[in-house]
Amino acid sequence: MKISGVDIRPGNIIEYEGGIWKVAKIQHTQPGKGGAYMQVEMKNLQDGRKTNVRFRSADTVEKVRLDTQDYQFLYEDGDQLVFMDQDTYEQINLDSDLLGDARPFLQDGMTVQLELWEEKPISVQLPQQVEADIVEADAVVKGQTASSSYKPAVLDNGVRIMVPPHIESGTRIVVDVYEQTYVGKAG
């Protein structure tokens, strides 16, 4: 399916210059002179190269259609992750790099979606939101309530995020995996 250059979104898988690329970041730019364009940072899923490309609204790219299949995360073996197909119980080993920044949020027994291109796994999608425990949270500074103040906190997986002042150590919260932001209290 062809899409316009300005319709590219993070997470899209596109075909570009003979390769399969995953869009990591986009930035819409409207210069004072000339036409608007989309600055796209993407990673080649076959060899791991990264590149930045400008797409104008007149440019079109082929959006790759992927098959998705549910797998369950079993365990980690070095830098390999072992998943099990929930239908056939077949196990598959994948490189932990496929998860990118979402890697710390992978939990034992978690159901994930493997994205397959020509029956080869190219991406692992975790649930959008997961629960995590706060193991360390800074104290609230009195008088900091004039603006919507957030404070730094550390999750049980080692990731640092900003949380509201009322969140303390030991609190279970919901976190957006891909934005790595606080969503709310769990439960």
From Swiss-Prot:
The record, for CDD domains, names: S1_EF-P_repeat_1, S1_EF-P_repeat_2
InterPro entries registered for this protein in UniProt: Elong-fact-P_C, NA-bd_OB-fold, Rib_uL2_dom2, Transl_elong_fac_P/YeiP, Transl_elong_KOW-like, Transl_elong_P/YeiP_cen, Transl_elong_P/YeiP_CS, Transl_elongation_fac_P
Q: Chief location of this protein?
A: cytoplasm
SUPFAM superfamilies per the record? Nucleic acid-binding proteins (SSF50249), Translation proteins SH3-like domain (SSF50104)
The annotated pathway is: Protein biosynthesis; polypeptide chain elongation
What PROSITE patterns does the annotation carry?
EFP
Q: Name one Pfam family in it.
A: EFP
Organism domain of life: Bacteria
Tell me where in or outside the cell this protein is found: Cytoplasm
| Keywords, comma-separated and alphabetical | Cytoplasm, Elongation factor, Protein biosynthesis
Q: Which GO terms describe its molecular function?
A: translation elongation factor activity
Biological process per Gene Ontology, one example term: peptide biosynthetic process
Family from the record: Belongs to the elongation factor P family.
Q: Name the PANTHER family for this protein.
A: ELONGATION FACTOR P (PTHR30053), TRANSLATION ELONGATION FACTOR KOW-LIKE DOMAIN-CONTAINING PROTEIN (PTHR30053:SF14)
Classification via HAMAP family: EF_P (MF_00141)
Query: NCBIfam families under this entry?
Result: efp, PRK00529.1
Q: Name the job this protein performs.
A: Involved in peptide bond synthesis. Stimulates efficient translation and peptide-bond synthesis on native or reconstituted 70S ribosomes in vitro. Probably functions indirectly by altering the affinity of the ribosome for aminoacyl-tRNA, thus increasing their reactivity as acceptors for peptidyl transferase.
Write the protein's name: Elongation factor P
Give the organism the record lists: Erythrobacter litoralis (strain HTCC2594)
